[in-house]
Amino acid sequence: MAVGGNNWSMWLRMSRVHLRQITKSLDRTLISLSHGNFSHQYNRNIFVTWWKSLFEASTAFRRASGLTVSPLTRRGIARFDHFRPVPNVSKFASFPRVPKGAPRGLFTNWNMTTSKRLLGQRAYSTSSIKFTQEAVNNMTISLRCFFNSLGGLNQCSHSNSCKAYQNASNVTSKQDHVQPVALKKLSQKDINFIRNLELFKIMKTQNEVVDETSAYYMEKPGSYIEFTISEFNVNGTFSAPLSFLDPSLLADLDEMIRNYKYELKSIYSSVDMILQNYGSLPITFHRNKIRIHFPNSTVVETEKLIAGLNIATGVIYADTSPDISLEGTNLNALVNVDNSGSVWSFVKEPSFPSRSAFSPILSDASYDTYELV
């Protein structure tokens, strides 16, 4: 019997060792499959925690029946049911029920509805509703404090809300002529009425109906981009009217010339880029300004076209000059009257047959030599 007892204890000891090794291997497998999603306190005993939860005492307790005779029942002490397993208790039940893909740690008020089909989960957040209610409550409290600071409404005219609001506004102006009356704090009904009345006044006085069919709001096609060539002025750099030649003065003059050339080259490159992308558009010159016209585009559309070329040196305006690009009309050419460059006039010329005076926007570069004289 002694030998049998020793063998039995040894078998139990070996069984415990093997069970411990099996649980460790199961823990490592679960951790590798979960990619470290378990909390640190369960990283080493996941399987043991789940196994113990099947046999832990449930929170529900009951009194022993009257037929059972025990010291506990005689004393009226409740006992726990140690052998009743708790249903659906697992490690995953302790995780927060947050839907897959939801931002963790941002919202805590997730309402979950577990579906019985395929154990699917649905979630919706009440954060926006909660914040809206808080904003309404803050507005209500601020309005209540504001009107309470004025002394409240007239109690004598409280039956009529409109008269109450009028009397409350006239109390301060007629205090010297009217005997004091009993005032009370604003009720929720008064606050709602005043709030609705103020909103109604705002809606009546600060509304604006935009008539999109009006010619004022309809933008007509026709715009141009204007490049301004700055004047080469040396007075801004050399303040003294009289100076003497020296290397530093020549270096400053050379830098001014190089900067002026760079500005001219940037304008030329912008104009050349418009020609290469949008074709033979109308161009006019006036003193130190170069204007490239877009007859078929509004200001907004022209801004988009110019922004697509990364051009930032010109200014776009609406074109209010006579339309010279309509087919079937006479071509109006700009002619310098006094050869001074300051006075220009329009001269009618016969229109070209079967084509417009200028190529449309977004067309290929034309090889015809039609230009403004």
Curated annotation (Swiss-Prot):
Up-regulation conditions: During stationary phase.
GO function term, MF aspect, one: proteasome binding
InterPro entries the UniProt entry points to: Stationary_phase_5
Domain of life: Eukaryota
A Gene Ontology biological process term: proteasome assembly
Function, as annotated: Required for survival at high temperature during stationary phase.
Record protein name field: Stationary phase protein 5
Annotated gene: SPG5
